[in-house]
């Protein structure tokens, strides 16, 4: 086992604080409408330019192991805030730095760290309750646009696109962010249910100019197995041919003789058919086939429930107004499914989302809800260079998460004002059990001014003057660093999602409390490489002597 280096008390805390400040100072320059960029070197390719706090935090690793421990703990704050609300990482880092700096000064002055922590926890709990009182619902398209704009570093086009996307696919809908091909940002909305499986044979294409298969008012045959024998399909094909409608087959796979016969029939114009693989794998595939069945009022032909493909009739087939298939995707538009059954299925999947512990599973279930509930929106980010594209994509992702958080828990005045107002409201009545807890409460409430001060500093103004003016104001009165004007923050469209502000404060206080109560730090001693090399060299010399 490697030897350890151990530091106690003030020695440990000084080192840890240095690491906290290095990381926080690098992250906090990105805060606010006039926040600066940080350039991150990459081991290969062009450097990355970003204004995303968590991206900066993730890159920082310090040489001194004690300092690095401090930095890593603040990095945890940024990551946790990012996971919880998708934004607010820089605010969380600034708050953590402020609480740790104030707290460690009090510890150095001889106060009890545990009582300080209890005081901080009381202050945070009271401020979180007050934030909920200050919060107002985020419902209108204008408010959604404003939240998106602020979170994308005052990029109004991004705010508009997110607002339009939510209008088109609903607040629960899936909105994804992809690389665009031009210089402009675009919004692409896919209505209906789309899944990532294309046609099994290019011979099914009936629109050569777009290389797609388009079927109007088709029947849909849903099968939970591979189809290789055409005999199994004959009864269904005959029924569909008599009805004079096209057919889409969605199965685990269609291969061999069955696929060849379908292609020949399509090319001869006997019956208009297309086949695609079912989306997903394993249990997820079965669930998605069932989703399609409910959407199109069909039945999944599954041997598990004793159904046979040869005995399938037209009553077992689903129907839709239109189906469009390209080489990568299949889109089912306007299935004829019963609205009540679709809503029941959506409610069932939402229940699974609530119970799921895996982020990946939640994301996949959320996608299924969106596909059943009405569509998917894709924001295509345009930029002149790849470096700009990465930076912009990060901002759009942040804005999207912030907007979802705003819809979920409402909005408060932005620009650091909500924390200042909430802190002022609880300061008068909140008392600790002893004097040291009161100091903890005061230092936590004082630290809550830090985001406002940092936004002002990044805008090149004097933080103390602005903070004093804001504290003397009331309600939503604050300072708009973008236009350098005072006024009502909500009227000016400077909004923060309540969830983002709340999460940032809670995670910052949690980690800062642990750091203030740290008394000992243990790390591995660095290995002495020179000594190792020297020993190896001596061994070689001995060998030489033996040969002589």
From Swiss-Prot:
Organism: Haemophilus influenzae (strain ATCC 51907 / DSM 11121 / KW20 / Rd)
Taxonomy of the source species: Bacteria, Pseudomonadati, Pseudomonadota, Gammaproteobacteria, Pasteurellales
Entry EC number(s): 5.6.1.7
One GO term (biological process): protein refolding
Predominant localisation class: cytoplasm
Class of enzymatic activity (EC top level): isomerase
GO cellular component: GroEL-GroES complex
The UniProt record lists the keyword Protein transport: no
Keyword vocabulary terms for this entry: ATP-binding, Chaperone, Cytoplasm, Isomerase, Nucleotide-binding
Described function: Together with its co-chaperonin GroES, plays an essential role in assisting protein folding. The GroEL-GroES system forms a nano-cage that allows encapsulation of the non-native substrate proteins and provides a physical environment optimized to promote and accelerate protein folding.
Gene Ontology MF term list: ATP binding; ATP-dependent protein folding chaperone; isomerase activity; unfolded protein binding
CDD domains per the UniProt record, alphabetical: GroEL
Gene: groEL
Subunit structure: Forms a cylinder of 14 subunits composed of two heptameric rings stacked back-to-back. Interacts with the co-chaperonin GroES.
Pfam families attached to this UniProt entry: Cpn60_TCP1
Compartments, as annotated in UniProt: Cytoplasm
Highest taxon of source: Bacteria
Name of the featured protein: Chaperonin GroEL
Residue positions binding ATP: 30-33, 51, 87-91, 415, 496
Catalytic activity as recorded in UniProt: ATP + H2O + a folded polypeptide = ADP + phosphate + an unfolded polypeptide
């Amino acid at each position: 086992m490697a030897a350890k280096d151990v530091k106690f008390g003030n020695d440990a805390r000084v080192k840890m604080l240095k690491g906290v400040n290095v990381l926080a100072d690098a992250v906090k320059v990105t805060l606010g409408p006039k926040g600066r960029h940080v350039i991150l070197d990459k081991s290969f390719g062009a450097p990355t330019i970003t204004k995303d706090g968590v991206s900066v935090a993730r890159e920082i690793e310090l040489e001194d192991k004690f300092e690095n421990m401090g930095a890593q703990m603040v990095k945890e704050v940024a990551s946790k805030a990012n996971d919880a609300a998708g934004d607010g990482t820089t605010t969380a880092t600034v708050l953590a730095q402020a609480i740790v700096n104030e707290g460690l000064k009090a510890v150095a002055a001889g106060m009890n760290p545990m009582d300080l922590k209890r005081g901080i926890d009381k202050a945070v709990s009271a401020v979180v309750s007050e934030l909920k009182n200050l919060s107002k619902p985020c419902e209108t398209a204008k408010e959604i646009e404003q939240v998106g704009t602020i979170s994308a570093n005052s990029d109004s086009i991004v705010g508009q696109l997110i607002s339009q996307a939510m209008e088109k696919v609903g607040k629960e809908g899936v909105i994804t962010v992809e690389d665009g091909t031009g210089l402009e940002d675009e919004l692409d909305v896919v209505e209906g249910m789309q899944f990532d499986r294309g046609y099994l044979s290019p011979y099914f294409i009936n629109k050569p100019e777009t290389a797609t298969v388009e079927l109007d008012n088709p029947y849909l045959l849903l099968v939970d197995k591979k189809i290789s024998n055409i005999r199994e399909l004959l009864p269904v094909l005959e029924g569909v041919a008599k009805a004079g409608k096209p057919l889409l087959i969605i199965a685990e796979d269609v291969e061999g003789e069955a696929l060849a016969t379908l292609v020949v029939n399509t090319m001869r114009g006997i019956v208009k058919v297309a086949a695609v693989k079912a989306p997903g794998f394993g249990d997820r595939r079965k669930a998605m086939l069932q989703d399609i069945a409910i959407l199109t009022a069909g039945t999944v032909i599954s041997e598990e429930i004793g159904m046979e493909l040869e005995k399938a009739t037209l009553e077992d087939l689903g129907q839709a107004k239109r189906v469009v298939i390209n080489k990568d995707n299949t889109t089912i538009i306007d299935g004829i499914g019963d609205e009540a059954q679709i809503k029941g299925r959506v409610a069932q999947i939402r229940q699974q989302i609530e119970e799921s512990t895996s982020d990946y599973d939640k994301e996949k279930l959320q996608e299924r809800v969106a596909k059943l509930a009405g569509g998917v929106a894709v924001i295509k980010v345009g930029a002149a260079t790849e470096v700009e594209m990465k930076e912009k994509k990060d901002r759009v992702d942040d804005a999207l998460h912030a907007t979802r958080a705003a819809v979920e828990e409402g909005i408060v005045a932005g620009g650091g004002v909500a924390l200042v107002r909430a802190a002022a409201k609880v300061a008068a009545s909140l008392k600790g059990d002893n004097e040291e807890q009161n100091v903890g409460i005061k230092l936590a409430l004082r630290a809550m001014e830090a985001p406002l001060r940092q936004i002002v500093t990044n805008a090149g103004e004097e933080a103390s003057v602005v903070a004093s003016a804001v504290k003397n104001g009331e309600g939503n009165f604050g300072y708009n660093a973008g236009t350098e004007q005072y006024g009502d923050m909500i009227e000016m469209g400077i909004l923060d999602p309540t969830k983002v502000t709340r999460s940032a404060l809670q995670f910052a206080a949690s980690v800062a409390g642990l750091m203030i109560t740290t008394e000992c730090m243990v790390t591995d001693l660095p290995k002495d490489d020179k000594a190792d090399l020297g020993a190896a060299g001596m061994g070689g010399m001995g060998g030489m002597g033996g040969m002589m």
